[in-house]
């Protein structure tokens, strides 16, 4: 649909470089994706608030696992496998996991069974079907694991977060991989292919967690790619046409 419309419209607002592959170059304007104003560079105050709100241990490092707006069953499967194996590599780490409303009942049962076998699990993994304050969850996290839909990528750049992207393969023209690679090429994110994620997702995030200089570099470079005024820029382009 986008390609068909691209030949008929006067202006095409995009969020990433390289869109000349899909649209006429003279129509492209780099605006970014509109996101809520709460997504700003994370501060220490925001981090402390997020850690408190989500019941995390302030003495630990934190990973936030989020599967996108519809929540990824694959990411949930990976989390269940990692937890059932005893959360390897999680010493000194808290994990906040958004599991999604659709999956919550099954995960409640799974977590009850796993906690009965390993009572320390409740001190390592916090999970919820829905995260109301994504800005604070991002702020609490030292590393985020996420799908790479357009809105998620824009939010994470605006928040200046270090992220391991797991692009969904179940999207048109593999656009989530293109979204993630736009950051990876600028050393602003890391990527694990969906096909490799079962074995590599958590080890990659946990390894990154032990590299504060790498995290700082990813955060800085992600921030450079943020386009926080996207809504205004798009509105300006619309006004030019009317």
Please annotate each region the language model reported.
Residues 83, 205, 209-213, 238-242:
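Short, hydrophobic alpha-helical segments
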Residues 45-52, 56-144, 177-180, 185, ...:
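Donor-nucleotide binding loops and adjacent catalytic segments primarily
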Residues 214-228:
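A short, well-ordered alpha-helix in the C-terminal region of glycosyltransferases
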Residues 134-176:
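A donor-sugar binding/catalytic signature common to diverse glycosyltransferases
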Residues 227-242:
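C-terminal alpha-helical cap of glycosyltransferases
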Residues 190-196, 208-212:
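Conserved acidic donor-binding segment of nucleotide-sugar-dependent glycosyltransferases
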Residues 1-48, 54-58:
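Active-site-proximal region of nucleotide-activated glycan assembly enzymes
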Residues 10-11, 27, 136, 143, ...:
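Well-ordered beta-strand positions
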